[in-house]
Amino acid sequence: MNTFTWNDMNSTAREYILMSKDVRDMQYRKQWPAPGDKTLIELVASENKALKFYLDLTENKRSSSLILGLSADRKSTMQTRVSDRPLIRLDYSDNLEVLRHRNPDGSLIVGTHVHFDLDGYGAKWACGIPGQNILKPKSYDFASLFWSFQETCNITDKLKVELSLGV
């Protein structure tokens, strides 16, 4: 596959992602999880309130070492799912070598990448940000990727997630 597009996605997953979603508890200020933690935000779609959507935010533990300064490799994940079915997931790292994913065809993706729900594979297939045209960040920094993810998943822009500097 050259460039992933909306048409490559499972049609039901695409329909779910494109549904307009709001925060179920109407609490729009959330905190990004601390290293080693996960935040689960329940979402509701106005088109079908029976569906249970979630935005999962995960901040992996960081391995820090003191070598003329502090070096902490950040690994974060944001995922939108319906019940227990992942629809789209973004795996982010500020160090290309820390984040690797092997696709079902054996190809290796290194660095920040996005998983899509594809027919026959679920969300096991990933590509780098430049290898798709679904998630369209203004830049590849963490904040821009998060806002683009939120927009792509059609999650209300009222939701504000505060990031900590976390070391």
Describe the function of each predicted region.
Residues V23-D25, L118, Y140:
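Intrinsically disordered, low-complexity regions enriched in Ser/Pro/Gly/Gln/His and often acidic
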Residues S46-R100:
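Aromatic- and glycine-enriched beta-alpha-beta binding-site module
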